[in-house]
């Protein structure tokens, strides 16, 4: 699993926190950030440079002109797919945690209101005696 990341020397893909991708001249720069350990001020990161792939394509439908374009390297595309799986999985976990906390707060509110209602009913019973 995560063979492309492992080929970059990343032995523990689960330690990845996030990544950034930018274009610089004819290169794509991938920066991978890892989770901070306790006591660290900055997250550890590694940077990789991928040359953009050059392609010559037909410029218009008449077939008379050609133009050269640059696009992302196929290897980088595979690495990004793996990074997206890791980072999106963490986002799903964060969303689930937030949902559970929201549900818990709602339950707390409902129970609190119900307790107040029951106490009021008890108060009515004791006043009628």
UniProtKB/Swiss-Prot annotation:
It comes from Pectobacterium atrosepticum (strain SCRI 1043 / ATCC BAA-672). Belongs to the UPF0325 family. HAMAP family: UPF0325. NCBIfam families: PRK13677.1. It comes from the Bacteria. InterPro entries: UPF0325 (IPR020911). Pfam families: DUF3461 (PF11944). This is UPF0325 protein ECA1027.
